[in-house]
Amino acid sequence: VVVGLSGGADSVCLFLILEELRKKIGFEILAVHVNHGIRGEEAKADEEFVKTLCEKKEIPCRSVSVDIPKMAVEYRMSEEEAGRTARREIFEQAAEEWGGTRIALAHHQDDNAETFFLHLARGSGLRGLGGIYPVNGMYIRPLLCVGRKEIEDYLKGREMPYCIDATNMEDAYMRNRIRNHVIPYFKENINEKTVEHMNRSMDQLREIWDYMERQTESAYQICTCLLYTSPSPRDS
């Protein structure tokens, strides 16, 4: 399993859980850290934290540096999109070179709620409103069933430190604005369990989409079969 390890609370939690499961099940782990070239010394400190954690747990670690601002300009995309693209390429390359069959990412319920708002605002259809899938190809997201607070409480209980990305508190990115303002507003003024309820709705939307996909494929196969088995006009 290739695990994305930024050093933040979410990825550290996932790393520790996989490390515990590794002892019981017997699979191998490769931690991959991506330095986005944005936060200077803070990013270097995160990288050192990740390397130290992996050494302590005797888990191999691969660290890759990318100039995300430069990549964003070259490919005419936002830094958020450039970061996602770079991470995906790095994780998949690591999996291919190392022989990994799964890539584990630390998305959780709060991330999924943010994604729902983003997709809703952009006019996404049923597939997009289903949010993040727990399993999508070789990608797995074991923490999608828990929230950010549960993750932080888990780390606190284990007395495990983690890195804090100060840019997450800035409103420079749309996702940050949703995280820092929209979701807190819903929790405080509408329903304190907004995130949990949204994730439940997204689960149902994913089930509906998957059902429609299966039914569409089944109908297509029937139509194809009828097309190739129907007698031609000359035979009638």
List where the protein language model places each region.
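Single conserved hydrophobic/aromatic residue that forms the stacking wall/gate
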Residues: 228-236
